[in-house]
Amino acid sequence: MALTLTDVKRIAHLARLEMADADAEHMLGQLNELFGLVEQMQAVDTAGIAPLAHPIEQIQEVAQRLREDAVTEVVNRDDNQRPAPAVQDGLYLVPKVIE
């Protein structure tokens, strides 16, 4: 799927970004290259291939370098919300920014 210049300008508008025509054309090229790469990856037949956490697992045994998931500190919501300008029912209140 290739984007058009109109698509890039619409996306910029929705993101509330000002973008000059030259920048939009440059971004169009970059996005289309990215989408081309994604299409190439999607075209690869991966049926029957087990997902890997580390591709090197195919060559050698890899020990997971992940730590045990354990609680190391207790978060006190009241202490964290005390400096906030507005809090209600444990939630931070912020001004409306999008209509």
From Swiss-Prot:
<keyword id="KW-0436">Ligase</keyword>
<dbReference type="GO" id="GO:0005524">
    <property type="term" value="F:ATP binding"/>
</dbReference>
<protein>
    <recommendedName>
        <fullName>Aspartyl/glutamyl-tRNA(Asn/Gln) amidotransferase subunit C</fullName>
        <ecNumber>6.3.5.-</ecNumber>
    </recommendedName>
</protein>
<dbReference type="InterPro" id="IPR003837">
    <property type="entry name" value="GatC"/>
</dbReference>
<keyword id="KW-0067">ATP-binding</keyword>
<comment type="function">
    <text>Allows the formation of correctly charged Asn-tRNA(Asn) or Gln-tRNA(Gln) through the transamidation of misacylated Asp-tRNA(Asn) or Glu-tRNA(Gln) in organisms which lack either or both of asparaginyl-tRNA or glutaminyl-tRNA synthetases. The reaction takes place in the presence of glutamine and ATP through an activated phospho-Asp-tRNA(Asn) or phospho-Glu-tRNA(Gln).</text>
</comment>
<comment type="subunit">
    <text>Heterotrimer of A, B and C subunits.</text>
</comment>
<keyword id="KW-0648">Protein biosynthesis</keyword>
<dbReference type="GO" id="GO:0070681">
    <property type="term" value="P:glutaminyl-tRNAGln biosynthesis via transamidation"/>
</dbReference>
<dbReference type="InterPro" id="IPR036113">
    <property type="entry name" value="Asp/Glu-ADT_sf_sub_c"/>
</dbReference>
<dbReference type="GO" id="GO:0050566">
    <property type="term" value="F:asparaginyl-tRNA synthase (glutamine-hydrolyzing) activity"/>
</dbReference>
<keyword id="KW-0547">Nucleotide-binding</keyword>
<comment type="similarity">
    <text>Belongs to the GatC family.</text>
</comment>
<dbReference type="Pfam" id="PF02686">
    <property type="entry name" value="GatC"/>
</dbReference>
<dbReference type="GO" id="GO:0006412">
    <property type="term" value="P:translation"/>
</dbReference>
<dbReference type="GO" id="GO:0006450">
    <property type="term" value="P:regulation of translational fidelity"/>
</dbReference>
<dbReference type="GO" id="GO:0050567">
    <property type="term" value="F:glutaminyl-tRNA synthase (glutamine-hydrolyzing) activity"/>
</dbReference>
